[in-house]
Regions:
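N-terminal pre-Walker A segment at the start of P-loop NTPase domains
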Residues: 1-10, 221-242
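Glycine-rich P-loop/Walker A and Walker A-like loops and their local beta1-loop-alpha1 context
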Residues: 11, 18-49, 235-275
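Hydrophobic/aromatic beta-strand patches that form the interior of the parallel beta-sheet core
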Residues: 24-26, 53-55, 85-87, 151, ...
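Conserved inter-motif catalytic segment of the P-loop NTP-binding fold
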Residues: 50-129, 275
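Conserved nucleotide-binding/hydrolysis micro-motifs of P-loop NTPases
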Residues: 58-62, 90-95, 119-121, 150, ...
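P-loop NTPase motor core
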Residues: 100-171, 175
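Phosphate-binding/switch region of NTP-binding enzymes
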Residues: 149-211
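Charged, amphipathic alpha-helical linker segments immediately N-terminal to NTP-binding catalytic cores
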Residues: 197-232
Length: 275
């Protein structure tokens, strides 16, 4: 069985095992980080020796490579090793020509395929219900055809969180919704794990950032069953404190309450506990 990774530690833990055939839908507002996440998944699996194909209808290759290089994703390097290929398909093509070209590319032995974005393709056939249904069915079956990981990127209008791609939400294995908003004059990024087939969703939403030379970092809160066992016993040197609480252990969480007018309140308590 082919196994894949997301390439982001926090997400790998939430999603669990990714076994082919597998489909991930990445949806989000413009600028939310969809292309960055799709590229991260590609890059992480290419480093494991899996061939990745990135099909784009918008992105410029040089611009994408340059931006990802700043995030620590060396796409040129894996391209030179034959593990990454970027193909831009202009929307001026007829939809049948685009699918024919995708079919030819799929036959070249790729394990990971990104389509950025499926929204653009569906927009072309918006008025043709039968063609739209046929196109969606094609992408349903695609990961089975090449027995690998398919990553679909979808655009969400600002202010909306509904994907609006029809039944595709029911057949994909994982759905990530990327969001961003302004809080206290700062940009806050959130990732919602809306669906992960075969894994319980213990944490549905987490903060993340996109850092230079690092890429995507997801800040997942601890899951209750993963809280470590109590550490070694500690006995406070302060006799008064010792008489009140006895002892405590490394890893304990201690709530300290004191009146605001107490002299050296917080500093004094921290000094006592640190001994």
């Amino acid at each position: 069985m082919k196994r894949f990774v997301i390439g982001v530690p926090g997400l790998d833990k939430l999603v669990g095992e990714v076994v082919a055939p597998y489909t991930i839908l990445i949806a989000g507002h413009p600028g939310a980080g969809k292309t960055t996440l799709a590229s991260t998944i590609c890059y992480a699996n290419a480093l494991k020796g899996e061939k990745c194909l990135y099909i784009s209808l918008y992105e410029d290759k040089e611009k994408l490579f340059r931006y990802m290089e700043r995030l620590g994703l060396k796409l040129r390097e894996i391209e030179s090793n034959g593990l990454f290929r970027f193909v831009k398909l202009p929307l001026t093509f007829d939809i049948n020509m685009i699918i024919d070209e995708v079919g030819k590319l799929v036959g070249e032995g790729y394990s990971v395929i990104v389509v950025d974005s499926i929204t653009a393709l569906l927009e072309v056939v918006r008025e043709n219900v039968e063609k739209r249904a046929w196109l969606l069915n094609y992408f349903y079956q695609l990961p089975v055809l090449f027995n690998g990981l398919l990553i679909l990127v979808s655009e969400l209008p600002f202010g909306e969180e509904r994907i609006g791609l029809g039944s595709i939400e029911f057949v994909v294995d994982s759905i990530f919704i990327l969001k961003h908003r302004i809080e206290d004059h700062l940009l806050t990024r959130l990732i919602e794990v809306r669906k992960t087939r075969g894994s319980p969703i213990n944490i549905a939403e987490a903060y993340f950032t996109i850092a230079e030379n690092i890429g995507i970092v997801v800040f997942t809160p601890p899951i209750l069953q993963e809280i470590p066992h109590e550490g070694e016993e500690l006995v406070p040197i302060c006799n008064a404190l010792k008489n009140v609480i006895g002892h405590f252990h490394k890893g304990f969480i201690i709530n300290v309450f004191f009146p605001p007018e107490a002299p050296m309140g917080r500093e004094a308590i921290l000094a006592i506990l640190s001994t």
